Amino acid sequence: MSETNRIQQGRVISDKMDKSIVVAIERTVKHPIYGKFIKRTTKVHAHDEDNTCGLGDKVEIAECRPLSKTKSWTLVKVLEKAKI
């Protein structure tokens, strides 16, 4: 088993929970028949210990041990604050 954590970047789509955020990770996949590249989105719950993230922020998250039923990611850093 690898010792390195999986790191992803995404946008915060919800910050209403205490010490938790929901991050949308966007990726492109090639359609198996037509060959066109399509955007696909995955939503993951991440741990935000200090409640530093806001809605629309671009963040970097890393995979960790399961923290709850749905949380297996933790916030590494905020890459870009949302323009309000």
From Swiss-Prot:
<comment type="function">
    <text>One of the primary rRNA binding proteins, it binds specifically to the 5'-end of 16S ribosomal RNA.</text>
</comment>
<comment type="subunit">
    <text>Part of the 30S ribosomal subunit.</text>
</comment>
<keyword id="KW-0687">Ribonucleoprotein</keyword>
<dbReference type="InterPro" id="IPR012340">
    <property type="entry name" value="NA-bd_OB-fold"/>
</dbReference>
<dbReference type="GO" id="GO:0019843">
    <property type="term" value="F:rRNA binding"/>
</dbReference>
<comment type="similarity">
    <text>Belongs to the universal ribosomal protein uS17 family.</text>
</comment>
<dbReference type="Pfam" id="PF00366">
    <property type="entry name" value="Ribosomal_S17"/>
</dbReference>
<keyword id="KW-0699">rRNA-binding</keyword>
<keyword id="KW-0694">RNA-binding</keyword>
<protein>
    <recommendedName>
        <fullName>Small ribosomal subunit protein uS17</fullName>
    </recommendedName>
</protein>
<dbReference type="GO" id="GO:0006412">
    <property type="term" value="P:translation"/>
</dbReference>
<dbReference type="InterPro" id="IPR019979">
    <property type="entry name" value="Ribosomal_uS17_CS"/>
</dbReference>
<dbReference type="InterPro" id="IPR000266">
    <property type="entry name" value="Ribosomal_uS17"/>
</dbReference>
<dbReference type="InterPro" id="IPR019984">
    <property type="entry name" value="Ribosomal_uS17_bact/chlr"/>
</dbReference>
<dbReference type="GO" id="GO:0003735">
    <property type="term" value="F:structural constituent of ribosome"/>
</dbReference>
<keyword id="KW-0689">Ribosomal protein</keyword>
<dbReference type="GO" id="GO:0022627">
    <property type="term" value="C:cytosolic small ribosomal subunit"/>
</dbReference>
